[in-house]
């Protein structure tokens, strides 16, 4: 009787172990199936250009199924495909934006003369037709231009006044103002003396402008006073054409710089795409 009991107990234990093994096997198969489901959803999301959903599901495979090695490797390959697709999308979008800036530039360009002395200038400048250089030297004025690289500059000109000015201040009747940095004699600060007259020309290039051009662009519909600041101060009110010319130069500068930035970003995406494609084509070690 005791022997029969022992046999039944052994049989019961064997059945329990078998059931446990079956449960583990079922669990593993279930996990494997779920990992493949995540991978399938990621593949479908990639086909629909839904890159964030695809990446989220690939990341989930590594977290939820750390032992599903085949699916994790497949997810890595798929992630590379996603990165390539993202860069192709970015390049296409940037190309469309570059075309927009080209159209904008071509329209704005009509308001400018391109001036370049090939003997000593590598790059030329765009000069607003409203304030041509040839007709402004005999005036007390504030003219503008844009380098071929897109850098905006202002030039303050005093004709017949000797104050050694080195900076300017733009202000409106409500007290708002912007003031340039000081441009010293070792910069673009020129003083020309003839037999009958003294001319002062100071160029505020790049950061030297310190927001004066943007201030004039913003408040171009308001009266704007320019103060020439040196040993003493001289003031004048900008004419409508002076304000409009500076506003046009400000917009042209933004367009050129925007195109340059887009071209730079496109180059980065193209370089990354080439890297990903080379990495994919490289034979496994």
What are these model-predicted stretches?
Residues 24-27:
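C-terminal motif of bacterial Sec signal peptides marking the signal peptidase cleavage site
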Residues 29-32:
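Bacterial signal peptide processing site
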Residues 55-87:
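Short, charge-rich amphipathic alpha-helical segments embedded
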Residues 196-203, 221-285:
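Internal interaction segment
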Residues 39, 46-47:
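Hydrophobic/aromatic side-chain positions at a characteristic register within alpha-helices
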Residues 1-12:
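N-terminal secretory signal peptides that target proteins for export/translocation
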Residues 79-109, 120-122:
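Alpha-helical linker/edge segments of TPR/alpha-solenoid repeat scaffolds
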């Amino acid at each position: 009787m005791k022997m029969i009991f022992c046999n039944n107990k052994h049989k019961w234990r064997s059945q329990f172990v078998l059931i446990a093994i079956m449960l583990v096997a079922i669990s593993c198969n279930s996990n494997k199936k779920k990992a493949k489901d995540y991978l399938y959803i990621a593949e479908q999301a990639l086909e629909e250009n839904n890159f964030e959903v695809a990446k989220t599901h690939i990341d989930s495979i590594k977290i939820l199924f750390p032992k599903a090695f085949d699916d994790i490797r497949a997810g890595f390959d798929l992630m590379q495909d996603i990165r390539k697709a993202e860069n192709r999308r970015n390049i296409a979008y940037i190309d469309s934006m570059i075309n927009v800036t080209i159209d904008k530039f071509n329209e704005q360009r009509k308001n400018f003369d391109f001036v370049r002395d090939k003997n000593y200038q590598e790059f030329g400048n765009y000069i607003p037709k409203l304030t041509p250089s040839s007709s402004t030297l005999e005036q007390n004025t504030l003219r503008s231009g844009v380098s071929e690289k897109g850098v905006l500059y202002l030039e303050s000109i005093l004709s017949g006044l000797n104050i050694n000015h080195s900076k300017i201040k733009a202000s409106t009747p409500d007290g708002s103002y912007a003031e340039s940095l000081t441009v010293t004699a070792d910069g673009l600060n020129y003083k020309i003396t003839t037999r009958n007259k003294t001319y002062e020309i100071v160029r505020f290039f790049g950061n030297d402008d310190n927001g004066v051009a943007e201030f004039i662009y913003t408040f171009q519909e308001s009266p704007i006073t320019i103060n020439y600041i040196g040993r003493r101060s001289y003031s004048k009110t900008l004419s409508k054409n002076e304000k409009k010319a500076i506003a046009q130069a400000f917009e042209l500068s933004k367009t050129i710089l925007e195109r340059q930035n887009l071209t730079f970003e496109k180059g980065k995406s193209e370089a990354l795409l080439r890297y990903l494609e080379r990495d994919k084509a490289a034979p496994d070690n």
